[in-house]
């Protein structure tokens, strides 16, 4: 007689199984394609007929399951089948699962549903027919064929449930093979099905070992963890209702629902009343000398889990196995234990009408016992509290590591959802990361879809924000006499404002008010104001508590005053947070609180920074000596007073430097990725005024030229306040501080090279929704045309503009390279790499019309070192 070696025989069986699984998967793939051609209406009709057929056969299927498994209660299984068909259908019937399922026109989003693919459905012996109905319905509702691996001990009843819904589906127009199953169940067959390349997702319900296998397939899996449900009856609970809920829940189908109560914790104050109520309803309390017998009867030898044969048996059957005499009408066995954990085996999940009871000496102890119960094999599943104290209900929910925290509810039927609460109805309950699951909610049809999003391009909403009031013309300072609520004024300025009598001018105007305000002056602002100066001024501000802050001076005074205002209004503000870079000012990671108390007024005494109308302030960190541009709409002044009388005596060199700063503001804001119809006109007018009046403003210092440049400064400020700047400012911020070059002069030196750089086709394109294509070259050409410069091509116009900027700088006395500013070649070589990196990090870089690489920034700095035109 020929004997086949065991190993070879095993290999042959595995091959047979593989052939079978391949055939099922191939049919499933064809069914998937056929289902994809069905409309939403056709799918809904098919699933509705499946649910009706399951309702019609719910008693027959329950009887089959009860007879085949020998577990649970026939009548309860019938209810579960009815729930799986009726409640599930009611929950999913209106779900859109085919094609376009939603549209948000405002956001430009269209949602498209597509099936996951062929699903492997694994079902348990505890709820065989109801789980089959449930999984088949949610699979077909979402256009997914399903192949079942039934539990061997419930193969025939599960198979019949699948046949019932499949026959109904096909009569309703469904293609064949949308529901299939393994005919000869085995661990090997289930394993091969779960791991088959044709399976898109594993939908697993069963023991922890099987669920773990599902998650180890390397493909999406929806599996659930085991339950070990604590139920806390707190002293304010409605005792009769709580006991009724627990008895009904724990005895339902002989405790086989994984969400059923396992350990009941009772406050000592009501312990006797609760136990008496249990006894009044045929619950048997195990005597001390019977406890060990009960443990031995239902727990395995290692006391690490329940014996499989015990699952779903009646209380009387279990008592008989344990040798414990109980009345014939006993419906529940209760074991009083004093703790939870391995020393108390009955505190584990029991899946039978056996309940552990623990007396709690306090709410704190009760919470701890419930928490320990979850950690003892039930993490993530379900926890219950019976109490009338709403605060305690929330505290319990916050404390327990359970994805379903039920209040005043029978756990078994509460956890599955929709009967006692608004949880999604389901027979597969996710336990989240606590239970090593991928989901934390009740599984339903929406979990079996790929949702595609068609996202239309949209521009970010932009805002044009400037001070609420801008006063201009000579003697605009007189507006201070009529403004509301000026009672305590703090003037922030540099020492020169006091020395040259400007603060006195402001004081004299303020004293013309009907009620003269109190006035304090902080006059210690230095060029490039530091955090130390800001904090010093803040100290005076906090002590004085002004209702009005007046920043008088150039950019340094206004920037320092803005920072003081920021900290004064919101002391919790962090300079570290405020200095951080952002891509979108409306989405910035760190928000500066909007001011609520003091009115902030800016009176510029130079024509350059535009700070009087911008949400920006440049502050130097005293610890690192690095300049940081702060940017937030909270820093926008309330009032700007543009009075040319304050700039008539500004020295020529300062007028030249600040004038070139105006030009840089205007040009960078014009080509910025955030430039808009609201800003470009301001930019162009500022450019025009600068080219027309800067030279005479420097050389002659006449009233008309100075006033025009003062206006140009504010126009450019309004433009860049809303369109932002670019890498000229990014670099100038860094090299100005490093080499001691005035900010406007640094911009003047850099601007011609920035124009040429930005006008070349980018190596890295800028990314901003409104900036639809690279246009910096034509933008610069448009500026050149506006100024009447010569050029027959875009390139020629760009070059004319760069040369015109260089010549304007020279004409006002600026040496247009870094070397002429006293920067040695040694200094440059030592710092250039660091400067380039810091410039890239600068806030202004993000709005540049093309993304600048650090190497390119370095080249710009190098070129500007000894450049001559």
Name each model feature, range by range:
Residues 2-110, 138, 280:
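N-terminal Rossmann-like NAD(P)+-binding subdomain of aldehyde/semialdehyde dehydrogenases
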Residues 8, 17, 133, 211-334, ...:
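ALDH superfamily catalytic-core signature
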Residues 10, 324-460:
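Conserved C-terminal structural/oligomerization subdomain of aldehyde/semialdehyde dehydrogenase
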Residues 96, 161, 532-645:
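Glycine/threonine-rich beta-strand-loop-alpha-helix active-site module
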Residues 100-241:
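Rossmann-like NAD(P) dinucleotide-binding subdomain of oxidoreductase/dehydrogenase enzymes
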Residues 280, 613-723:
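Carboxylate- and glycine-rich phosphate/diphosphate-binding segment that chelates Mg2+/Mn2+
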Residues 738, 744-830:
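Gly/Pro-rich interdomain helix-loop hinge
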